[in-house]
Amino acid sequence: MAASPLVVQKTEEEWRAVLSPEQFRILRQKGTEKPGTGEYDKFFEEGIFDCVGCKTPLYKSTTKFDSGCGWPAFFEGLPGAINRTPDPDGRRTEITCAACDGHLGHVFKGEGYGNPTDERHCVNSVSISFNPAKSSSII
């Protein structure tokens, strides 16, 4: 069992001071970027994707795949890094950073992408940052 990330708590004003307006809208207000506009949708370099709000490692690049949905797609997060909460309507499951509770996107299961987990973590590019493989020891 992996260790849980450290909890990061900030006031709304503190989040606004460290995030861009678009990052704040998505991470803290549970917004969504327009499909096909994100920096990491068609990005496939080796490394680790971190939460842009608190820098917690979330995804290995080896779990990223091209789903064609217009947002970065991963089939699995790092152990203990991501929380899941079913939306009230039960149609989707929200994914958030386990450390700072920042909104990442949603996870979908059973879509037939043929990956090992049969899941698609549909993540807003604005919610994540990338660390290349040479500066990362988790790959």
From Swiss-Prot:
Catalytic reaction(s) noted: L-methionyl-[protein] + [thioredoxin]-disulfide + H2O = L-methionyl-(R)-S-oxide-[protein] + [thioredoxin]-dithiol
InterPro entries, A to Z: Met_Sox_Rdtase_MsrB, Met_Sox_Rdtase_MsrB_dom, Mss4-like_sf
Active site positions: 122
Organism of derivation: Arabidopsis thaliana (Mouse-ear cress)
The protein's name in its UniProt record: Peptide methionine sulfoxide reductase B5
Top-rank lineage group of the source organism: Eukaryota
Required cofactor names: Zn(2+)
Residues bearing the modification N-acetylalanine: 2
Family membership: Belongs to the MsrB Met sulfoxide reductase family.
Pfam families for this protein: SelR (PF01641)
Cofactor binding remark: Binds 1 zinc ion per subunit.
Function text: Catalyzes the reduction of methionine sulfoxide (MetSO) to methionine in proteins. Plays a protective role against oxidative stress by restoring activity to proteins that have been inactivated by methionine oxidation. MSRB family specifically reduces the MetSO R-enantiomer.
Alphabetic keyword roster: Acetylation, Cytoplasm, Disulfide bond, Electron transport, Metal-binding, Oxidoreductase, Redox-active center, Transport, Zinc
Disulphide bridges, residue numbers: 69-122
Molecular-function GO term, any one: metal ion binding
Residues that bind Zn(2+): 51, 54, 97, 100
Compartment(s) where it occurs, according to its Swiss-Prot or TrEMBL record: Cytoplasm, Cytosol
Top EC class for this record: oxidoreductase
Signal peptide: none
Record domain MsrB: where: 12-133
Gene Ontology CC annotation, any one: cytosol
Protein EC: 1.8.4.12
A biological process from GO: protein repair
